[in-house]
Amino acid sequence: MHTMTTPAETTPNLMPWTDSLNTGDARMDETHQEFVDMINTILATPEEEQLPVYKAFLNHTVEHFAQEERWMLATGFSADNCHAEHHATILETMRVVEAHYLDTDKQIITRMAEALAEWFPGHANSMDAGLAAHLQSVGFDSVTETLADPSAIKNVTMSGCGSVSCS
């Protein structure tokens, strides 16, 4: 019997949003869901049409990471904490990907989106979940970006990543 391939079967593996990606902070989770949606949009876009979608994704990721870093600084993390360093490394790599795409490697955006889809769950479940728990513990409202009690923030700055698995 001959079976036909449907378009869904030829679409790249998309990154599903699952409850396991929730961090416990509604605003962070909303931003993360947008991040996942944009990865899926890239993977569903033909390679020759990906650059504008990727540029929008890069801009979103810059703001996504800046948002988390504002929260870190507002709640006692040092500016050079390892969570922010992870963000900087990802953004540097994403910028290099754009340059390679323009220099004729039309598959690199797809490869980057696939790599981010693999990386992101671990990051969300460790560093971001740790940050969300920290924000909650100090009474930080991520919607208003305010502290219920500013005295809850200690004078000592944290240099770790916010994860229970990072010092």
Question: Model segments located where?
Answer:
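Small-residue-biased structural context
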Residues: H2-S167
